[in-house]
Amino acid sequence: MLILVLSFQLNAKKITNKVLVYSTAENLTKEEVAVLGISKDVTLIEINKSKFKVNGDRVYIAPGRHTFQVKKPLSITYDGELSATLEAGKYYVLDTWTEPAGGRYYRVIYKVFEVSEGDFENYNRKVLNMLIILSKN
């Protein structure tokens, strides 16, 4: 199920963590948080204006509406911002890809997908492509 999409521009200082528990989720149990997986092609640099730097890992986050500032590392000219409502006990993946936009131009698209726990644990580009096809039907 497609949750939401894009917009642009920001720089951030580097903060790293393997598994990041977003501050508003620190006192919540596993069943009370949403799990956001960050694909290897995306760097999450901000959640609700709080600076982070997470790439290819997962974030345990309090449920609710969140705004993310993200960046595709290999594409310096495109930064993105998106928002999504995350629910407790559910799994999401933040991913990106490009589409032709005419001539030499292309558009960078960021999306948050809800996935099953199994798909989350085995997440890869093949799973994303299947989700994109399903979201268009």
What are the residue ranges of the model-derived segments?
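Short loop/turn and low-complexity linker motifs enriched in small/turn-promoting residues
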Residues: 12-137
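Bacterial N-terminal signal peptides
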Residues: 1-7
